[in-house]
């Protein structure tokens, strides 16, 4: 088990910058998830930690040792890729022990490590099977087991669940979470799926355009995003955004005007620092934080465009006539029977709102959310 430190790390190919000025501290035994859209540099960052990509600028430390020029095999890391990369002609036991055999580990010790890891991953009854006789989830566990038997100090996982169907992804998320708690190893996990990030991580690193957009615990990022990008990326369905104008500013609250027919004005409990009267901002509110109109002092009138009945919840896409933008999503943990074209009023609770400046940075929220 070891800590990982990245100090002003960058990667470029000629004049093209893939990652830039990455500063991260990953503690011993921590489960950290790198998340972001395709092309944001998350897999490149993981490969730099693994030693599969050279670091152009900055320094990488694993366990307080500078690793920039250390070979991958000597970094004390183990890596699981999106592809299982199992040898089809070898059984599970031989696949798991293959790396140990190449490293010259004696057979008795190889067998002992394989059996211990097989018990942890519930593979003991499959050790004599070939990969073709295994399910997708079992193959992924074998790939994880192959890494575990090498006893790495840092465990790297590059989108390991991407090839699995939805049900298996849920199952393997649970298995990986249990595995981390049991082993207490430092784990760094890459995914584009923010649901995986929210459910697995002790700490999430949100990446965008090769840089760090925000680092924090899952609920911190959900309730207190540092910028509009993080607010829109974390959460499913994603946050709604409405254009608003500032009409008054105080130290601990900002008054805004909605662009609807009634031009509603109301105060939002956020820091007024750096906000000016007349400024155009973005109001953010999550679909699950909208409420029935009778439960709020401020409401919006919308036209129902699409209704998604999911059994345990309903998601309604609304068009706000005065606002030319993508539809507003309203989510409730109940069955709501409405039809396309119906008028519907929804309520806004100021305490659950976010405000973002024109440059995308968030006004500091002052409402205390549970669990943060």
Curated annotation (Swiss-Prot):
Residues where ATP binds: 36-43
Gene Ontology MF terms in the entry: ABC-type maltose transporter activity; ATP binding; ATP hydrolysis activity
GO cellular component, one term: ATP-binding cassette (ABC) transporter complex, substrate-binding subunit-containing
Annotated compartments: Cell inner membrane
Domain of life: Bacteria
EC number: 7.5.2.1
Keyword Electron transport listed: no
Gene3D superfamilies: 2.40.50.100, Nucleic acid-binding proteins, P-loop containing nucleotide triphosphate hydrolases
Keyword line: ATP-binding, Cell inner membrane, Cell membrane, Membrane, Nucleotide-binding, Sugar transport, Translocase, Transport
Boundaries of every ABC transporter domain copy: 4-234
Disulfide pattern: none
Catalytic activity: D-maltose(out) + ATP + H2O = D-maltose(in) + ADP + phosphate + H(+)
Enzymatic class: translocase
Entry membrane topology: Peripheral membrane protein
Chief location bin: membrane
Function of the molecule: Part of the ABC transporter complex MalEFGK involved in maltose/maltodextrin import. Responsible for energy coupling to the transport system.
Self-association state and partner proteins as the record states: The complex is composed of two ATP-binding proteins (MalK), two transmembrane proteins (MalG and MalK) and a solute-binding protein (MalE).
Similarity-based family: Belongs to the ABC transporter superfamily. Maltooligosaccharide importer (TC 3.A.1.1.1) family.
PANTHER family given in the database record: MALTODEXTRIN IMPORT ATP-BINDING PROTEIN MSMX (PTHR43875), MALTOSE_MALTODEXTRIN IMPORT ATP-BINDING PROTEIN MALK (PTHR43875:SF3)
Protein name per its UniProtKB record: Maltose/maltodextrin import ATP-binding protein MalK
Organism: Mannheimia succiniciproducens (strain KCTC 0769BP / MBEL55E)
């Amino acid at each position: 088990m070891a800590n990982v430190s990245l100090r002003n790390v960058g990667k470029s190919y000629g004049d093209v910058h893939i990652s830039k000025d990455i500063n991260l501290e990953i503690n011993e035994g921590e489960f950290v998830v790198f998340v972001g859209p395709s092309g944001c540099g998350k897999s490149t960052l993981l490969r730099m930690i693994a030693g599969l990509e050279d670091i152009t600028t900055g320094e990488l430390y694993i366990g307080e040792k500078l690793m920039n020029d250390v070979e991958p095999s000597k970094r004390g890391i183990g890596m699981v890729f999106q592809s299982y990369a199992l040898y089809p002609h070898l059984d599970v036991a031989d696949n798991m022990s293959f790396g140990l055999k190449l490293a010259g580990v004696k057979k008795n010790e190889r067998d002992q490590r394989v059996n211990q890891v097989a018990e942890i991953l519930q593979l003991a009854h499959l050790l004599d099977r070939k990969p073709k006789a295994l399910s997708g989830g079992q193959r992924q566990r074998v790939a994880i087991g192959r890494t575990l038997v090498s006893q790495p100090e840092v465990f790297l996982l590059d989108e390991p669940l991407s090839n699995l169907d939805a049900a298996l992804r849920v199952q393997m998320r649970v298995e990986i979470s249990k595995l981390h708690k049991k082993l207490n190893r430092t784990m760094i996990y890459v995914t584009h799926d923010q649901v995986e990030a929210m459910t697995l991580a002790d700490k999430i690193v949100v990446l965008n355009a090769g840089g760090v957009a925000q680092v924090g615990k899952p609920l911190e990022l959900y309730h207190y995003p540092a910028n509009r990008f993080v607010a829109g990326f974390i959460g499913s369905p994603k946050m709604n955004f409405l254009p608003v104008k500032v009409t008054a500013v105080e130290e601990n609250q900002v008054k805004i005007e909605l662009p609807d027919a009634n031009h509603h004005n109301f105060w939002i409990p956020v820091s007024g620092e750096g906000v000016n009267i007349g400024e155009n901002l973005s109001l953010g509110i999550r679909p699950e934080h909208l409420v029935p109109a009778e439960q709020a002092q401020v409401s919006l009138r919308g036209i129902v465009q699409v209704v998604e009945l999911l059994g345990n919840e309903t998601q309604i896409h609304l068009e706000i006539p005065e606002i030319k933008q993508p539809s507003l999503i309203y989510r409730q943990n109940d069955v709501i029977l409405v039809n396309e074209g119906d008028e519907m009023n929804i309520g806004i609770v100021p305490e659950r709102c976010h405000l973002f400046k024109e440059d995308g940075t968030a006004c500091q929220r002052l409402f205390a959310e549970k669990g943060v």
